[in-house]
């Protein structure tokens, strides 16, 4: 075996340990990275505790992360505590990097959700918790920053029960900024016994039968309830002053359990890619089952591609070590595997967590280099960033030739701009950020362009029928033409032309929620080619779309607004101005809970407005819920070359008939 800074004794200890993969999650500025750094230091993985303010953190390794004090990319490190190896995934806390957060959910055995004792529950907090709850991921809630002035823990406890879950178990009490246990293996309060009985039928039966139940019995039941994501323990601390960190480590090693291995066959999931300063590609994999060995030859996905593992590392106590084998539930690092993409798997297809819906960006902007000769450099850099983060979608507009990037928000745009400048040495300018609208035909229409009928220059006849479909259906393509008459290559060319045409409608936005039927075709055998059909299709499609007209679709958000009762009138007025659809309002003496749908374009900044007018008490949580016909103003995205004389001639020809 080969080792780097690790002995054979350490390695054999490692492969016999229980291994868990833990996500560290939080809203921005809750102290997530600081908590992670304290876990590393307290466990002995680092010799000093990194500080965000000093820019010397282990997990935020990118220069921009250290400078801005936010996490951009999920990073993985490792600690050992109470005989358990814990791979820690420090994830972004900003909504603009939610895609990075979502990817980590696929590999978590448990999570620590960090709240700020001062700021309390934010919109991002509830979004994260709802996902953890939906996927039944065991979760510990850690209330950080209990040292801050003005902290009201009783109000926060009520907020947790109101906005997160009633199934929380407060494990400690806080006195003069210090934490003391009130629930352990040796002691449990009477009210907590009732809590456990209400969540476990076996304990309840023993309790009602006056059978002896020891504190250890209650404790083991709590462990089981947490492992099943039925109960969420709540702990307290201050990363700034290293308060409650050891207790958090104890809770992690007690409550988060490793999964049972179901097979000895290799199954590994690729969740992260990064490039080192020399450009070498580093791929991070979670070994779901079996093991990955040096010099193994393994299949990528279900394809015919095989790769040989020429180098292999894992993470041990905060550092990487070279090994010959990485076992089940551990993290493997493989370098210079060019065929790897995030989301790939090796060996048997893993049973990844189901029910996770990826949020697609609904904003876009054009980007151009300050120096036009550096355009190819920008494209190459964006491609590298896309390999590292597949949610970074960019394309070249087929009409304007502009580079367009889809975005989650302003912060992501600023991060991309800084990365291009500092990492790739190219300065760029972003145009105004736009909402991404879509288009849908209004009515069913049919359009035909005949072969050898001017101004048609192509050796093809094409007839297309367009008809609208229900919102959210997407694009459907059908053909009424027999393959015996027109073979696959010609028909595939038409289908390609349809897909290309749907990229830009009458207002420049993607055309969706429609069925396109290929209804008529004619060709001349000696001269017609698939290219004739491919190139004519967009003109037929465009003319049909003009005849139909289009509805403009705008992205919608499902929202939940939790505010003090005193602010409810203002909130309802605001929601009406934003053209929201209020579906439910429930109020009591203190709080008002409003649910509904609201356009993205009118509600971009409303979360910060809610926080402002409720003095931090209100929560505005949103998630994408598809598109609907817009009720308000919208912007065009027209990029078509106005000098397209052929389209003009087709339009003129059709209008004269």
Swiss-Prot record:
tr-type G domain mapped to chain residues: 17-260
GO MF annotations, alphabetized: GTP binding; GTPase activity
Signal peptide: none
Gene Ontology biological-process entries: response to antibiotic; ribosome disassembly; translation
CDD domains reported for this sequence: Tet_C, Tet_II, Tet_III, Tet_like_IV, TetM_like
Biological role stated in the UniProt entry: Abolishes the inhibitory effect of tetracycline on protein synthesis by non-covalently modifying ribosomes. Confers mild resistance to tetracycline when expressed in E.coli.
Record-given protein name: Tetracycline resistance protein TetQ
Organism per entry: Bacteroides fragilis
Gene name of the record: tetQ
């Amino acid at each position: 075996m080969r080792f780097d800074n690790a002995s054979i004794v350490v390695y054999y200890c490692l492969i016999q340990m229980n291994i868990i993969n833990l996500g560290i999650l939080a809203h921005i500025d809750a102290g997530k990275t600081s908590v992670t750094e304290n876990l590393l230091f307290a466990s002995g993985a680092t010799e000093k505790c990194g500080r965000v303010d000093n820019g010397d953190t282990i997990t935020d390794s990118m220069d921009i992360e250290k400078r801005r004090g936010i996490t951009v990319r999920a990073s993985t490190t490792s600690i050992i505590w109470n005989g358990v190896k814990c791979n820690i995934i420090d994830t972004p806390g900003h909504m603009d990097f939610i895609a990075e957060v979502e990817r980590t959910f696929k590999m978590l055995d448990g999570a620590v959700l960090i709240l700020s004792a001062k700021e309390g529950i934010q919109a991002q907090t509830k979004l994260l918790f709802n996902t953890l709850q939906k996927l039944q991921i065991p979760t510990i809630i850690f209330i950080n920053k209990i040292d801050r002035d003005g902290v009201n823990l009783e109000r926060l406890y009520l907020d947790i029960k109101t906005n997160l879950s009633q199934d929380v178990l407060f494990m400690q009490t806080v006195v003069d900024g210090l934490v003391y246990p009130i629930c352990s293996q040796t002691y449990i309060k009477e009210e907590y016994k009732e809590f456990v009985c209400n969540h476990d039928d076996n304990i309840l039966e023993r309790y009602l039968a006056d059978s002896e139940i020891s504190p250890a019995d209650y404790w083991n039941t709590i462990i089981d309830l947490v492992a099943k994501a039925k109960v969420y323990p709540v702990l307290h601390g201050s990363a700034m002053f290293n308060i409650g960190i050891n207790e958090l480590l104890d809770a992690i090693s007690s409550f988060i359990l490793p999964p049972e291995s179901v097979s000895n066959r290799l199954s590994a999931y690729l969740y992260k890619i990064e490039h080192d300063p020399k450009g070498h590609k580093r791929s991070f994999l979670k070994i779901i089952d079996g093991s990955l060995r040096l010099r193994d030859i393994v299949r990528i996905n279900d394809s015919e591609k095989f790769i040989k593992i020429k180098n292999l590392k894992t993470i041990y106590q905060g550092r990487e070590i070279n090994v010959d084998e990485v076992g089940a539930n551990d993290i493997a690092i493989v370098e210079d595997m060019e065929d790897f993409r995030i989301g790939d798997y090796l060996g048997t297809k893993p049973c990844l967590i189901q029910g996770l819906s990826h949020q697609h960006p609904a904003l876009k902007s054009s980007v151009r280099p300050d120096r036009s000769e550096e355009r190819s450099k920008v494209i190459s850099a964006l491609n590298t960033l896309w390999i590292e983060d597949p949610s970074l979608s960019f394309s070249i507009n087929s009409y304007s030739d502009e580079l367009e990037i889809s975005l989650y928000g302003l912060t992501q745009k600023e991060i991309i701009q800084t990365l291009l400048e500092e990492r790739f040495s190219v300065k760029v300018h972003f145009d105004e950020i736009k909402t991404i609208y879509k288009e849908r035909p209004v009515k069913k229409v049919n359009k035909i362009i005949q072969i050898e009928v001017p101004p048609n220059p192509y050796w093809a006849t094409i007839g297309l029928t367009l008809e609208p479909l229900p919102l959210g259906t997407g694009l459907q393509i059908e053909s009424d033409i027999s393959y015996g008459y027109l073979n696959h290559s010609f028909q595939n060319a038409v289908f390609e032309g349809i897909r290309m045409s749907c990229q830009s409608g009458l207002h420049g936005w993607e055309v969706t929620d429609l069925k396109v039927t290929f209804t008529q075709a004619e060709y001349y055998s000696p001269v017609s080619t698939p290219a004739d059909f491919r190139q004519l299709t967009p003109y037929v499609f465009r003319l049909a779309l003009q005849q139909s007209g289009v509805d403009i679709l705008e992205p919608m958000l499902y929202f939940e607004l939790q505010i003090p009762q005193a602010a409810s009138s203002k909130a309802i007025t605001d929601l009406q101005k934003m053209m929201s659809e209020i579906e439910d309002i429930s109020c009591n003496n203190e709080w008002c809970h409003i649910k509904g749908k609201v356009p993205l374009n009118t509600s971009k900044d409303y979360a910060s407005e809610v926080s402002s007018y409720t003095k931090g008490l209100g929560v505005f949580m949103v998630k994408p819920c598809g598109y609907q016909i817009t009720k308000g103003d919208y912007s065009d995205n027209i990029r078509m070359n106005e000098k397209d004389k052929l389209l003009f001639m087709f339009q003129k020809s059709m209008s004269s008939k």
